Amino acid sequence: MSDSYREQHKLRLAYMPWLYPRLKPRHRAWAEPWQKKVQEELERLETVRFGEHCFVAPQARLFAEPGRDIRVGDHSHIAADTVLHGPIRLGAHVSINHHATLEGGAAGIEIGDHSRIAAYATLYAFNHGREAGDLIREQPVTSRGIRIGRDVWLGARCGIVDGVTVGDHAVVAMGAVVTRDVPPWSVVAGNPARPIGRRPGAPPEEGGER
Protein backbone atom coordinates (compact mmCIF):
# COMPACT_ATOMS: atom_id res chain seq x y z
CA MET A 1 0.00 0.00 0.00
CA SER A 2 1.42 3.39 -0.98
CA ASP A 3 1.83 6.12 1.64
CA SER A 4 -0.60 8.39 -0.21
CA TYR A 5 -3.26 5.67 -0.31
CA ARG A 6 -2.85 5.00 3.40
CA GLU A 7 -3.16 8.68 4.25
CA GLN A 8 -6.33 8.90 2.18
CA HIS A 9 -7.66 5.83 3.96
CA LYS A 10 -6.95 7.48 7.33
CA LEU A 11 -8.82 10.57 6.19
CA ARG A 12 -11.80 8.48 5.12
CA LEU A 13 -11.88 6.82 8.53
CA ALA A 14 -11.61 10.20 10.25
CA TYR A 15 -14.85 11.40 8.66
CA MET A 16 -16.60 8.01 8.49
CA PRO A 17 -15.40 6.23 11.64
CA TRP A 18 -18.12 3.58 11.44
CA LEU A 19 -15.87 1.97 8.83
CA TYR A 20 -13.13 1.36 11.41
CA PRO A 21 -14.55 -1.87 12.94
CA ARG A 22 -15.16 -3.22 9.41
CA LEU A 23 -11.53 -2.96 8.33
CA LYS A 24 -9.98 -6.01 6.73
CA PRO A 25 -7.08 -7.61 8.61
CA ARG A 26 -4.46 -6.13 6.25
CA HIS A 27 -5.74 -2.61 7.01
CA ARG A 28 -6.25 -3.29 10.70
CA ALA A 29 -2.55 -4.14 10.92
CA TRP A 30 -1.65 -0.46 10.46
CA ALA A 31 -4.86 1.17 11.73
CA GLU A 32 -4.78 -0.23 15.26
CA PRO A 33 -1.21 0.96 16.06
CA TRP A 34 -2.09 4.33 14.54
CA GLN A 35 -5.16 4.65 16.75
CA LYS A 36 -3.26 3.50 19.82
CA LYS A 37 -0.76 6.30 19.27
CA VAL A 38 -3.47 8.94 18.72
CA GLN A 39 -5.37 7.95 21.86
CA GLU A 40 -2.28 7.66 24.05
CA GLU A 41 -1.20 11.15 23.04
CA LEU A 42 -4.62 12.59 23.94
CA GLU A 43 -4.55 10.79 27.28
CA ARG A 44 -1.12 12.28 27.92
CA LEU A 45 -2.22 15.83 27.11
CA GLU A 46 -5.74 15.91 28.59
CA THR A 47 -7.73 14.13 31.31
CA VAL A 48 -9.27 11.82 28.71
CA ARG A 49 -9.67 8.05 29.02
CA PHE A 50 -10.59 5.70 26.20
CA GLY A 51 -12.11 2.25 26.55
CA GLU A 52 -11.29 -0.75 24.38
CA HIS A 53 -11.54 -0.68 20.57
CA CYS A 54 -12.32 3.04 20.31
CA PHE A 55 -11.65 5.33 17.37
CA VAL A 56 -10.86 9.03 17.55
CA ALA A 57 -9.94 11.10 14.51
CA PRO A 58 -6.68 13.04 14.84
CA GLN A 59 -8.67 16.09 13.68
CA ALA A 60 -11.07 15.81 16.65
CA ARG A 61 -10.59 18.39 19.39
CA LEU A 62 -10.96 17.06 22.93
CA PHE A 63 -10.40 19.45 25.84
CA ALA A 64 -10.52 18.04 29.36
CA GLU A 65 -8.91 20.08 32.09
CA PRO A 66 -8.67 18.51 35.58
CA GLY A 67 -12.21 18.30 36.91
CA ARG A 68 -13.60 18.36 33.38
CA ASP A 69 -12.57 14.88 32.33
CA ILE A 70 -13.85 12.99 29.30
CA ARG A 71 -14.56 9.25 29.43
CA VAL A 72 -15.13 7.32 26.21
CA GLY A 73 -16.74 3.89 26.45
CA ASP A 74 -15.68 0.74 24.62
CA HIS A 75 -16.21 0.64 20.84
CA SER A 76 -17.11 4.33 20.65
CA HIS A 77 -16.14 6.57 17.72
CA ILE A 78 -15.36 10.29 17.54
CA ALA A 79 -15.08 11.75 14.04
CA ALA A 80 -13.06 14.62 12.60
CA ASP A 81 -13.72 18.28 13.37
CA THR A 82 -15.73 17.51 16.48
CA VAL A 83 -15.22 19.66 19.57
CA LEU A 84 -15.68 18.02 22.98
CA HIS A 85 -15.13 19.98 26.20
CA GLY A 86 -15.65 18.03 29.40
CA PRO A 87 -17.07 16.93 31.66
CA ILE A 88 -18.43 14.31 29.25
CA ARG A 89 -19.28 10.62 29.65
CA LEU A 90 -19.84 8.51 26.54
CA GLY A 91 -21.19 5.01 26.96
CA ALA A 92 -20.23 2.00 24.86
CA HIS A 93 -20.82 1.95 21.09
CA VAL A 94 -21.49 5.70 20.95
CA SER A 95 -20.84 7.52 17.66
CA ILE A 96 -20.07 11.25 17.46
CA ASN A 97 -20.05 12.30 13.81
CA HIS A 98 -18.05 15.07 12.18
CA HIS A 99 -18.44 18.72 13.24
CA ALA A 100 -20.55 17.91 16.30
CA THR A 101 -19.98 20.13 19.35
CA LEU A 102 -20.39 18.93 22.94
CA GLU A 103 -19.79 21.52 25.68
CA GLY A 104 -20.11 20.00 29.14
CA GLY A 105 -20.42 23.21 31.15
CA ALA A 106 -20.06 22.52 34.89
CA ALA A 107 -22.72 19.79 35.23
CA GLY A 108 -21.59 17.70 32.26
CA ILE A 109 -23.01 15.68 29.39
CA GLU A 110 -23.83 11.97 29.63
CA ILE A 111 -24.64 9.86 26.56
CA GLY A 112 -25.91 6.31 26.94
CA ASP A 113 -24.79 3.16 25.15
CA HIS A 114 -25.47 2.72 21.42
CA SER A 115 -26.47 6.35 20.81
CA ARG A 116 -25.69 8.21 17.58
CA ILE A 117 -24.88 11.90 17.39
CA ALA A 118 -25.10 13.08 13.78
CA ALA A 119 -22.99 15.67 11.98
CA TYR A 120 -23.16 19.28 13.19
CA ALA A 121 -25.28 18.41 16.24
CA THR A 122 -24.76 20.88 19.10
CA LEU A 123 -25.09 20.13 22.82
CA TYR A 124 -24.43 23.00 25.26
CA ALA A 125 -24.73 22.12 28.95
CA PHE A 126 -24.65 25.70 30.20
CA ASN A 127 -26.54 28.95 29.81
CA HIS A 128 -25.92 32.67 30.30
CA GLY A 129 -27.96 35.01 32.44
CA ARG A 130 -29.86 37.48 30.26
CA GLU A 131 -31.46 39.99 32.61
CA ALA A 132 -32.07 43.42 31.11
CA GLY A 133 -29.71 46.14 32.26
CA ASP A 134 -26.53 44.03 32.37
CA LEU A 135 -24.30 42.86 29.56
CA ILE A 136 -24.87 39.17 28.85
CA ARG A 137 -21.15 38.49 28.96
CA GLU A 138 -21.01 39.84 32.52
CA GLN A 139 -23.92 37.77 33.85
CA PRO A 140 -23.57 34.47 35.73
CA VAL A 141 -23.36 31.20 33.84
CA THR A 142 -25.56 28.33 35.00
CA SER A 143 -25.26 24.61 34.22
CA ARG A 144 -27.74 21.79 34.86
CA GLY A 145 -26.28 19.22 32.49
CA ILE A 146 -27.58 17.21 29.55
CA ARG A 147 -28.54 13.53 29.69
CA ILE A 148 -28.94 11.49 26.51
CA GLY A 149 -30.32 8.01 27.03
CA ARG A 150 -29.52 4.66 25.48
CA ASP A 151 -30.07 3.97 21.76
CA VAL A 152 -30.86 7.61 20.96
CA TRP A 153 -30.41 9.20 17.53
CA LEU A 154 -29.73 12.93 17.45
CA GLY A 155 -30.16 14.10 13.85
CA ALA A 156 -27.84 16.35 11.89
CA ARG A 157 -27.72 20.02 12.94
CA CYS A 158 -30.02 19.52 15.91
CA GLY A 159 -29.46 21.49 19.09
CA ILE A 160 -29.86 20.33 22.70
CA VAL A 161 -30.00 23.03 25.38
CA ASP A 162 -28.87 22.84 28.98
CA GLY A 163 -31.05 20.91 31.42
CA VAL A 164 -32.59 18.56 28.85
CA THR A 165 -32.93 14.80 29.22
CA VAL A 166 -33.56 12.75 26.08
CA GLY A 167 -35.09 9.41 27.01
CA ASP A 168 -33.94 5.98 25.87
CA HIS A 169 -34.66 5.03 22.24
CA ALA A 170 -35.79 8.55 21.27
CA VAL A 171 -35.13 10.23 17.90
CA VAL A 172 -34.46 13.95 17.44
CA ALA A 173 -35.03 15.05 13.84
CA MET A 174 -32.55 16.97 11.71
CA GLY A 175 -32.43 20.65 12.64
CA ALA A 176 -34.63 20.31 15.73
CA VAL A 177 -33.97 22.56 18.74
CA VAL A 178 -34.72 20.64 21.94
CA THR A 179 -35.67 22.88 24.87
CA ARG A 180 -37.52 20.37 27.07
CA ASP A 181 -37.25 16.71 28.02
CA VAL A 182 -37.97 14.08 25.38
CA PRO A 183 -39.84 10.94 26.54
CA PRO A 184 -38.47 7.48 25.74
CA TRP A 185 -39.29 6.14 22.26
CA SER A 186 -40.51 9.59 21.10
CA VAL A 187 -39.71 11.24 17.77
CA VAL A 188 -39.44 15.04 18.01
CA ALA A 189 -38.93 17.71 15.35
CA GLY A 190 -39.06 21.48 14.86
CA ASN A 191 -37.96 24.64 16.66
CA PRO A 192 -38.80 24.34 19.46
CA ALA A 193 -38.93 20.56 19.15
CA ARG A 194 -42.32 18.91 19.63
CA PRO A 195 -43.39 15.25 19.53
CA ILE A 196 -44.47 14.10 16.08
CA GLY A 197 -44.79 10.39 16.83
CA ARG A 198 -43.06 7.35 18.22
CA ARG A 199 -40.60 4.90 16.79
CA PRO A 200 -42.28 2.14 14.77
CA GLY A 201 -42.93 -0.86 16.98
CA ALA A 202 -42.38 1.08 20.20
CA PRO A 203 -44.11 -0.30 23.30
CA PRO A 204 -47.30 1.48 24.40
CA GLU A 205 -46.87 4.65 26.42
CA GLU A 206 -47.35 4.29 30.16
CA GLY A 207 -50.98 4.94 30.94
CA GLY A 208 -51.89 4.63 27.26
CA GLU A 209 -53.93 2.03 25.43
CA ARG A 210 -52.84 -1.58 25.82
Model regions and ranges:
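Flexible, glycine/small-residue-enriched loop-and-beta-strand segment within the central core
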Residues: 58-72, 77-165, 191-192, 198-208
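A generic "structured core" feature
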Residues: 161, 171-177
